[in-house]
């Protein structure tokens, strides 16, 4: 007997059965869908279970429980029952409310359906009434034919087949009403199916019945459903609620693109463009608008405007107000001014040689123009030397802006000169105290009193004439009066009480700048505030840099320079201009940004100054350029100040007929690029204290470009004036050489009319020009065709002699007319 007799094989029976269903879509599309049918497990209580084992039975008291414990348990049980009853009541109330809501909605739907059916019924009845009225009108219009037709169609008289056909036609005509009803009945389930589809999409599940229904057409997306629910929720909460407006601080530059403006306000670009169009501006999102228009738009959208400018990059330059407690005494800065050849440089050299240790290594460079000396009592003085020629007026003005005391040098044998007056005006404009140094008193022709008297004409009253301006008689050659001059300067400095804060970011002024071979751009800086140290990052004018080295006036490298100390600064990326302000900043990025902004601003300013703004100005400029001859030149100098001074002088040379145009001015040696520029424009190259390198010399020789070297600005100016004078047209002058009176007029064959004349004054020449005067009015000007004495052709006739004259191409001559004889000569002109 087997173990498996009467037993079934043990196995797992699947809880569900799978199958495939073909689902139909619109436009004839189908899809096979896998579905499964699950059987629901039903839980049935066991038959042996006691019906009285519920919570309602009295609990049995445990053997080890006390009365208090039992009391607590009973109270807890009663509380649980009470909560349970309350929960049941609440659930019943909620269920009742839900049922009422469902009933209300069903009532609304039924009311809408009834209203729709009534409307359709009224429309159907109206259509039937119109149809009956139309038929009645047709019947009245054709009563006789209708009567005949009705008689012929009478069922009593027609055969059975015709009666059936007529009955079928009548049924076809009267079947419109039931067909509409069937259409309405068929449309109603379609609405219900659509609602069912919405439920299916909302649930996200596909059942067997839904798959078999074949209703798989295009339906709304879940996002659309959610938007609809959100709108219904807002409507149920009391209408559309406006979202709270967020007010933003919008940074507004000088110009801004429309799209960027919309992004900063967090508004739609279309709304911003629409607002601009309302203001009359037809712009797109990629166009720029000015700050004023953008401000109106920002205020219209309810935001706040924060104006920013490109110049805000310079805000990083600290404008710190120094605390009086941090201020310390500083050396005075003395600027030596005066007329050329009055001994300014000689006086400074004498002071320096007298106060600087002999045998000093190095010494000041040729163009540093600033240095310090120490007096016998230990007082330090910083001197600035400004050139005396009139071309350096701008440099001298910049020197007066950084100076504390002006020493006006006047030669005792030359008195007050034009540039002395300029120096006085600069000192007065800068409101700087002045000390007069009367130099060259060692010469026999020296007259210091005349100098003091001449200064009175310019409101400079010295102490010897009961004024408040100190005057010292000195001699740079003999060294006379130098100590007294230094004492006067120190006394004036004590009166001024000069102080500065050394413990802050450095600020200074560029006295001179040059491009040095091997060292690059070098600037002589006079520190005015703070302390300049090695490694500091700074910006100066349109240039920036990092202090690579500091060199004092004695040629020594130093680590720092305090207030009123002149030093050479190495480490610039370009050559600044004399007078630019140096400021120390924190980072290299800030310095670069400030320098780039200043450079772009300077370019815009130059472009605006050089460009004609109207058509009339352009035409006038073009017309003037046609009549004005230009002398193009290229200027290279050793230092920036010299190049600037030469350019300013060149701009002043010329008149309404000729002018000098500086094609390029720079600092450093003459290079091949300078030669190429000069060759393209036909200009000479002028070098001031610089030379051309070997490639530049070879290029100039090959291209025929002239290079001239100068070390004195007078010679350069004179040569340029002479060259410009060569472009001037020569001046034509007339010299009257004689007068002749016509006594008789003769007609000569082959010649025409010939005037018999008497030379009354001067001389008559055959080659001279003549004018015919009648009643002292010029009626003809020309030349002589013939000049004869008796029958001979002669070159000239002296005064008191008679002669015959015939005019070239002119015969209207009468007795009594006067002939004026003159000669023309050309005189070369010079520029003053």
Curated annotation (Swiss-Prot):
<feature type="domain" description="tr-type G">
    <location>
        <begin position="329"/>
        <end position="497"/>
    </location>
</feature>
<dbReference type="InterPro" id="IPR006847">
    <property type="entry name" value="IF2_N"/>
</dbReference>
<dbReference type="InterPro" id="IPR044145">
    <property type="entry name" value="IF2_II"/>
</dbReference>
<feature type="region of interest" description="G5">
    <location>
        <begin position="475"/>
        <end position="477"/>
    </location>
</feature>
<dbReference type="InterPro" id="IPR023115">
    <property type="entry name" value="TIF_IF2_dom3"/>
</dbReference>
<comment type="similarity">
    <text>Belongs to the TRAFAC class translation factor GTPase superfamily. Classic translation factor GTPase family. IF-2 subfamily.</text>
</comment>
<dbReference type="Pfam" id="PF22042">
    <property type="entry name" value="EF-G_D2"/>
</dbReference>
<dbReference type="InterPro" id="IPR005225">
    <property type="entry name" value="Small_GTP-bd"/>
</dbReference>
<feature type="compositionally biased region" description="Polar residues">
    <location>
        <begin position="18"/>
        <end position="27"/>
    </location>
</feature>
<dbReference type="GO" id="GO:0003743">
    <property type="term" value="F:translation initiation factor activity"/>
</dbReference>
<dbReference type="Pfam" id="PF11987">
    <property type="entry name" value="IF-2"/>
</dbReference>
<dbReference type="InterPro" id="IPR000178">
    <property type="entry name" value="TF_IF2_bacterial-like"/>
</dbReference>
<keyword id="KW-0648">Protein biosynthesis</keyword>
<feature type="region of interest" description="G3">
    <location>
        <begin position="385"/>
        <end position="388"/>
    </location>
</feature>
<feature type="region of interest" description="G2">
    <location>
        <begin position="363"/>
        <end position="367"/>
    </location>
</feature>
<feature type="compositionally biased region" description="Low complexity">
    <location>
        <begin position="142"/>
        <end position="171"/>
    </location>
</feature>
<comment type="function">
    <text>One of the essential components for the initiation of protein synthesis. Protects formylmethionyl-tRNA from spontaneous hydrolysis and promotes its binding to the 30S ribosomal subunits. Also involved in the hydrolysis of GTP during the formation of the 70S ribosomal complex.</text>
</comment>
<feature type="compositionally biased region" description="Basic and acidic residues">
    <location>
        <begin position="227"/>
        <end position="244"/>
    </location>
</feature>
<feature type="binding site">
    <location>
        <begin position="385"/>
        <end position="389"/>
    </location>
    <ligand>
        <name>GTP</name>
    </ligand>
</feature>
<feature type="binding site">
    <location>
        <begin position="338"/>
        <end position="345"/>
    </location>
    <ligand>
        <name>GTP</name>
    </ligand>
</feature>
<feature type="region of interest" description="Disordered">
    <location>
        <begin position="1"/>
        <end position="244"/>
    </location>
</feature>
<dbReference type="InterPro" id="IPR036925">
    <property type="entry name" value="TIF_IF2_dom3_sf"/>
</dbReference>
<dbReference type="GO" id="GO:0005829">
    <property type="term" value="C:cytosol"/>
</dbReference>
<keyword id="KW-0396">Initiation factor</keyword>
<feature type="compositionally biased region" description="Basic and acidic residues">
    <location>
        <begin position="81"/>
        <end position="141"/>
    </location>
</feature>
<feature type="compositionally biased region" description="Basic and acidic residues">
    <location>
        <begin position="178"/>
        <end position="201"/>
    </location>
</feature>
<protein>
    <recommendedName>
        <fullName>Translation initiation factor IF-2</fullName>
    </recommendedName>
</protein>
<dbReference type="Pfam" id="PF04760">
    <property type="entry name" value="IF2_N"/>
</dbReference>
<feature type="binding site">
    <location>
        <begin position="439"/>
        <end position="442"/>
    </location>
    <ligand>
        <name>GTP</name>
    </ligand>
</feature>
<dbReference type="GO" id="GO:0005525">
    <property type="term" value="F:GTP binding"/>
</dbReference>
<dbReference type="InterPro" id="IPR053905">
    <property type="entry name" value="EF-G-like_DII"/>
</dbReference>
<feature type="region of interest" description="G4">
    <location>
        <begin position="439"/>
        <end position="442"/>
    </location>
</feature>
<dbReference type="GO" id="GO:0003924">
    <property type="term" value="F:GTPase activity"/>
</dbReference>
<keyword id="KW-0963">Cytoplasm</keyword>
<keyword id="KW-0342">GTP-binding</keyword>
<dbReference type="InterPro" id="IPR000795">
    <property type="entry name" value="T_Tr_GTP-bd_dom"/>
</dbReference>
<dbReference type="InterPro" id="IPR015760">
    <property type="entry name" value="TIF_IF2"/>
</dbReference>
<dbReference type="Pfam" id="PF08364">
    <property type="entry name" value="IF2_assoc"/>
</dbReference>
<dbReference type="InterPro" id="IPR013575">
    <property type="entry name" value="IF2_assoc_dom_bac"/>
</dbReference>
<dbReference type="InterPro" id="IPR027417">
    <property type="entry name" value="P-loop_NTPase"/>
</dbReference>
<dbReference type="Pfam" id="PF00009">
    <property type="entry name" value="GTP_EFTU"/>
</dbReference>
<keyword id="KW-0547">Nucleotide-binding</keyword>
């Amino acid at each position: 007997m087997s173990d498996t007799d009467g037993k079934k094989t043990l196995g797992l029976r699947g809880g569900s059965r799978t199958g495939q269903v073909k689902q139909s879509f619109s436009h004839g599309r189908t899809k096979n869908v896998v579905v499964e049918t699950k059987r629901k497990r039903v839980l049935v209580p066991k038959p042996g279970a006691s019906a009285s084992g519920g919570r309602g039975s009295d609990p049995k008291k445990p053997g080890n429980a006390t009365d208090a414990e039992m009391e607590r348990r009973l109270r807890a049980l009663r509380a649980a029952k009470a909560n349970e009853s309350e929960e049941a009541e609440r659930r019943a109330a909620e269920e009742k409310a839900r049922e009422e809501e469902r009933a209300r909605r069903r009532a609304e739907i039924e009311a809408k359906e009834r209203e729709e059916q009534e409307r359709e019924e009224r429309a159907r009845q109206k259509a039937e009434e119109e149809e009956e009225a139309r038929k009645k009108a047709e019947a009245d219009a054709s009563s006789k034919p209708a009567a005949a037709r009705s008689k012929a169609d009478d069922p009593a008289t027609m055969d059975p087949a015709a009666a059936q056909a007529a009955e079928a036609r009548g049924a076809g005509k009267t079947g419109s009403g039931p067909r509409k009803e069937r259409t309405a009945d068929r449309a109603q389930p379609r609405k219900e199916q659509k609602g069912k589809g919405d439920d299916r999409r909302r649930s996200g599940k596909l059942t067997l019945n839904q798959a078999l229904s074949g209703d798989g057409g295009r339906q709304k997306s879940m996002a659309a459903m959610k938007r609809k629910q959100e709108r219904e929720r807002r409507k149920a909460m009391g209408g559309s609620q406006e979202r709270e407006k967020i007010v933003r601080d919008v940074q507004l530059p000088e110009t801004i693109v429309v799209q960027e403006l919309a992004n900063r306000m967090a508004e739609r670009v279309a709304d911003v463009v629409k607002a601009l169009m309302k203001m009359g501006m037809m712009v797109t999102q990629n166009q720029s608008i000015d700050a004023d228009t953008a401000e109106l738009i920002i205020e219209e959208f309810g935001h706040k405007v924060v104006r920013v400018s490109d110049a805000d990059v310079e805000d990083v330059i600290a404008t710190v107000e120094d605390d009086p407690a941090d201020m310390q005494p500083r050396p005075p800065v003395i600027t030596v001014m005066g007329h050329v050849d009055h001994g300014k440089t000689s006086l400074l050299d004498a002071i320096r040689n007298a106060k600087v240790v002999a045998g000093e290594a190095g010494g000041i460079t040729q163009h540093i123009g600033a240095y310090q000396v120490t007096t016998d009592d230990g007082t330090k003085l910083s001197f600035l030397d400004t050139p005396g020629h009139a071309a350096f007026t701008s440099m001298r003005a910049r020197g007066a802006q950084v100076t504390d005391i002006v020493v006006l040098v006047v030669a005792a044998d030359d008195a007050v000169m034009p540039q002395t007056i300029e120096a006085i005006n600069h000192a007065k404009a800068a409101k700087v105290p002045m000390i007069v140094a009367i130099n060259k008193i060692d010469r026999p022709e020296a007259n210091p009193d005349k100098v003091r008297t001449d200064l009175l004409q310019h409101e400079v009253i010295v102490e010897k004439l009961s004024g408040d301006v100190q005057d010292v008689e000195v001699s740079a050659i003999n060294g006379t009066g130098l100590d007294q001059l230094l004492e006067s300067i120190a006394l004036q400095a004590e009166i001024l009480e000069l102080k500065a804060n050394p413990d802050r970011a450095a600020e200074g002024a560029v006295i001179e700048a040059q491009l040095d071979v091997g060292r690059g751009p070098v600037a002589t800086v006079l520190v005015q505030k703070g302390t300049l140290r090695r490694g500091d990052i700074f910006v100066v004018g349109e240039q920036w840099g990092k202090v690579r080295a500091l060199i004092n006036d004695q040629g020594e490298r130093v680590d720092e320079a305090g207030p009123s100390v002149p030093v050479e600064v190495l480490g610039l990326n370009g050559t600044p201009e004399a007078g630019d302000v140096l400021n120390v900043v924190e980072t290299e990025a800030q310095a670069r940004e400030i320098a780039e902004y200043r450079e772009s601003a300077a370019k815009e300013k130059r472009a605006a100054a050089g460009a004609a703004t109207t058509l009339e100005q352009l035409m006038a400029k073009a017309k003037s350029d046609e009549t004005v001859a230009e002398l193009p030149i290229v200027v290279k100098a050793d230092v920036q100040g010299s190049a600037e001074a030469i350019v300013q002088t060149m701009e002043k040379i010329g008149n309404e007929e000729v002018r000098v145009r500086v094609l390029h001015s720079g600092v450093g040696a003459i290079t091949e690029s300078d030669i190429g520029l000069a060759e393209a424009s036909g200009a000479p190259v002028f070098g001031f204290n610089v030379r051309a390198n070997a490639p530049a010399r070879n290029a100039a020789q090959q291209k025929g470009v002239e290079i001239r070297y100068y070390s004195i600005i007078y010679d350069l100016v004179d040569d340029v004036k002479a060259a410009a004078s060569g472009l001037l047209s020569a001046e034509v002058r007339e010299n009257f050489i004689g007068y002749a009176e016509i006594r008789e007029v003769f007609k000569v064959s082959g010649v025409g009319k010939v005037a018999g004349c008497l030379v009354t004054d001067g001389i008559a020449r055959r080659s001279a020009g003549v004018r015919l005067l009648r009643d002292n009015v010029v009626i003809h000007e020309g030349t002589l065709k013939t000049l004869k004495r008796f029958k001979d052709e002669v070159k000239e006739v002296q005064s008191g002699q008679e002669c015959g004259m015939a005019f070239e191409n002119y015969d209207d001559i009468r007795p009594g007319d006067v002939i004026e004889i003159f000669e023309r000569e050309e005189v070369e002109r010079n520029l003053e």
